[in-house]
Each structure stands twice: as structure tokens, then as C-alpha cells.
Amino acid sequence: IDKYISEHSLGAFRPKAVLFDMDGVLYDSMPNHAVAWQKSMEQFDIHMTADDAYATEGARGVDTIKKMVKAQQHRDIDEEEAQRMYDVKTSIFHEMPVAQIFDGVKELMQKIKECGMKIGVVTGSGQRPLIARLINDFGDFITEERIVTAYDVKNGKPAPDPYLMGMQKVGTKPCETIVVENAPLGVKAGVAAGSFTIAVNSGPLPDSALTEQGANIVMPNIKYLADHWHEIVR
């Protein structure tokens, strides 16, 4: 925190909002996403590994598909074709068991709320059922007006745009905002937006994959963050 304060020439760190990524931060959904990505892309002769799914997590799905097609099939596809391919991935994902909320998420949100801070969610997903689930699961803490989806921005993560849009929705400046992420692209987006960025390493990637993108702190899981929350907003 002291390093962040000095790097951004701040007198003190007084956060007013927390912006959460969704998959891999609020929900233990990344294993399902990895399987859905692999199975769906096989249908289009695209080879995608579980590690690829984790490494590209946070980006708009259509952007990931465009890059994979370009790299493996050496052709450019438009948004419409990428969306059709992404719809197959979405369909497979929704046939899988419902991902559980990570232990500690609601406890953390309660602590944030008690601090008088706002909460938003910034996701690369554009799936309406997932947005509805967010409201259902976390309605005590967030509103739909404070959720940023793939459809709210032209440039997805790792561009800062999704988190800048999130700040606009919660009404804070970058130096007043904490971003909680689990993916390298998401961390890069949070850092690029100027936020204090906490990485929760809930996946198989090494911590270095997150620190290399500029994460200010890396924590092993969201429960650990909940338990140590008051050390961050001291």
C-alpha cells in the first residue's frame, strides 16, 4: 500500500469502492469455463488448453476467439462469426453444474459495506443469466447499475476500459478504487486503470503470472482477503 501511495503521489490511501471480477473471484466457475472452452473450440478445429482458458480469462469471449482463429487458422473473422462460436461455448457452460460462491465472498462484501464503501462487479461475460444470478446472490451489496459486462465496453480486459467504466458507475476516481482480480489480463486492466489491484490466485497459474502484470498484492484465496480486510483499509 505504501508503495502504491508513493507511486501515485497520494497523501494517503482512502478507498471508496471495490470492483470485483466475477469468474474465479466471486464464483468457483473457472474449471467449468475451461472445459466449456475446450469442448466448444474443438467443434471449430481450434485447440485450446485449460491453461489457455485461465490465461485469457477476463477478456471478451469474442476477442479470445478472434485471436485463437487468427493464430491457428491464419484468418480474420468478424464479430458475428466470433459471437456464433462463443454462443456454442456459452451453451456448453450452462449445461454444466452451477458454480458455487467462494467461501468468504459475502463476509468480505459485508465488511466492505460496513466501511461505507460501494461495491461493483466488472466482468468480461455478456451472459444475461449470470448477471441475473449476481443480483440474486449479492442483492444486499450490488445493483445492476453497478455491473459492467462485455456489452458495456468496446475494448475488454486487458484494456483499462471495463474498470474505468466500473469507476464511472460507482462514482470514484482510480486512486479511490480497489480492484479484486484473479486473472493476468484482469490484473493488467486494473493496474492500467490506475487502481490498487489485489490478485486472488484461485487458479493453477503461478503467483508470478499476476505480479508480472502489476498486482499490488497477491492473496491465496478470497477468504484470506476477507480475514485480512481491515489491514488493507486501516
Question: Model regions: which residues?
Answer:
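Short, surface-exposed acidic
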Residues: 46-55, 73-85, 140-144
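Structured helix-beta-strand junction loops
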Residues: 59, 115-116, 213
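Asp-based, Mg2+/Mn2+-dependent phosphohydrolase catalytic module
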Residues: 1-16, 80, 110, 126-234
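A metal-dependent, Asp-based hydrolase signature
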Residues: 58-93, 103, 111
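A general structural signal for well-ordered alpha-helical segments in protein cores
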Residues: 34, 61-66, 86, 105, ...
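Active-site neighborhood of HAD-like aspartate-dependent phosphohydrolases
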Residues: 2-52
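Anion (oxyanion) recognition and catalysis
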Residues: 42, 113, 191
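Short, acidic loop-to-helix structural element flanking the phosphoryl-transfer center
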Residues: 6-9, 14, 94-121
